[in-house]
Structure formats: structure tokens, C-alpha cells
Amino acid sequence: MPTSVVTGGAGFLGSHLCDYLLARGHRVICIDNLVTSSLTNLEHIDDDDFVFVNHDVTDPIEVAERVDFVYHFAALASPVDYLRMPLHSLKVGSYGTHHALGLAKFKRARFLLASTSEVYGDPQVHPQPETYWGHVNPVGPRGVYDEAKRYAEALTMAYHNQQGVNTGIVRIFNTYGPKMRSHDGRAIPNFIRQALANEPLTVYGDGSQTRSFCYVDDLVRGLVLLAESDEHLPVNLGNPGEFSILELARTVLKVTGSKSEIVFEALPVDDPQVRQPDITRARQLLDWEPEIELEEGLRRMLPSYGREPVGV
């Protein structure tokens, strides 16, 4: 039985990953300090092969038993969180990644860094391949997250090149699904919360900016495929289907049956105008392709908000 350590395992993505690994017969050690996550995401797990450890990864990580995989997902990924705790965001990206890599080195485990499409910033190349270096403002408000991930990637490559650690890097594009916090600060949970409360849906800017939304089940499947490969260069994982934020808002209204209106507010500083993954590398290396389209994913997500989708 393989043993996997998942840092940030009580968060949105991390908890889905824990579920998937347990279903595949892994022993899972979940490490989280619960600052931005919740044990509610794990309370359904009743498995002797699951262990939860309340620990901050900015402190050294110690695991007594054998470890085969280290999935480093600890991060302040929500704008609400990294804008409120900018220094902690940078520390998790630096100290936290260093400690997770140190664990993988000591245990001779395969390491997978959860990086992000935010390393591309406000891209001037579209769609974004892994070879694109990005267009990022390091001193803007988003820099505390973007640069934390860019540094984490550099640190991961340094451990691979100098220390021989078996590492992988996944650049995750906008992902959604059950267990997202309703006040997460990201478009999909914001729109669903507003629609179900019959409040106006807040679109920033004119809504023409685009994103590509990947359902969490598709993403997690790709994560494990990448972890089980020997690829050490970054790999994009995301759904290449591209939607404007205004299209997203209208789709949420359709799925929820809400009569809410759409209102427009000023675009935040450094908000990217476009975001779409080039997943050629994932297709070629992993034979991975997302399967769940946006409207279907939103319908699957709604019951977690206590509401059934309309028009089913």
C-alpha cells in the first residue's frame, strides 16, 4: 500500500485529493493547520488508513513512517486569504515548500508541487503553454500569491537538479466543485451564493475577461496521473474551454433558476484579461483530457449548497 502525504489536505483541492487517493488504496497522511480550511471537508472519511495532523508547514515536517508521495497543496489560494495574510502566503510558498521538499528528499518520495496558472500573470501569450515565462507584477496586490508560487517552482527545480529529488510541478488552472467556501472570493462560489440568495451577481469590469474552468474530479484524476509519472517539468492541468465572466454569470443564473440581475463594478488591480491552458503536454504525457463541461459541473456542484439544479 503506497503512503501519500497531502499538505493542505483539509482545503478544497486537498480534501478531494485525499478522497481520491484513499479510493485508490493509498494510506493518506493529511497535514493542515486549518487557518483557511476546515475539518468539515474531511468529516465524512471513516478509514483506518487516513491520518490527520494539525501542523503548519512553515515549521519542519516530520513523519515517522515510510512515505511514497508528497503532494504539496498547502497555500493561501483564495484572494480573500492572501490579501488578508500576505506575509503568511509568502512564507507558505517559501518555508512550506522547502519543508515539504525536505520531507520528500529524506523519504526518497515522489514530490508534486501544486503550482498555479497565476505564474503566467496577465498573459501576453494565449493560450498559455508551459514554455511561457509569464507577465507578472511582483509588487502588485496579487504578487504575494503569484510570486510565492513562482519561487516554489524555482525551489522545486533546485531540489531536483542539485539534490536529485524526484519532483513534479502541476500548474493548476481555475478549478471548481463541491467544498468550495461560499465566501471564497472567486467567481463561481460568489455567483452561486449571490444567485441562491436572489442577490445581484457582481461582475468586475465589463465581464469580457475570460477564464477556463475545470471541474475538480477531472483535475484530481490528472494530478495523480502526473504524480505517478516521472515528468519533472511543469504541466498545465485545466479545462481549455474558455468563457467570459459574463457568460459564466449567465450560466449560473440558468442552472440555479435565479432571477437575480447582473451588476458591474470596477475591475481589481492586475486582474488578468485572459486565462486559458494549453494542455498539449498533459495530453501527450498523461493521456489526460477533462471530461466535464461547465454547465454539467455547476449542476454537480449545486447540491453542496443545499439546492438542486433546475432544468435537469
What are these regions (language model features)?
Residues 10, 117, 179, 207, ...:
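Acidic beta-to-alpha connecting loop that harbors the catalytic carboxylate
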Residues 84-85, 179-184:
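Short, solvent-exposed loop/turn segments at secondary-structure boundaries
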Residues 17, 55, 99, 174, ...:
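C-terminal substrate-binding subdomain of Rossmann-fold SDR/epimerase-dehydratase oxidoreductases
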Residues 39-42, 153, 189, 246, ...:
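Short, surface-exposed alpha-helical segments at coil->helix boundaries
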Residues 126-127, 182-190:
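A glycine/serine/threonine-rich, flexible loop-to-helix segment
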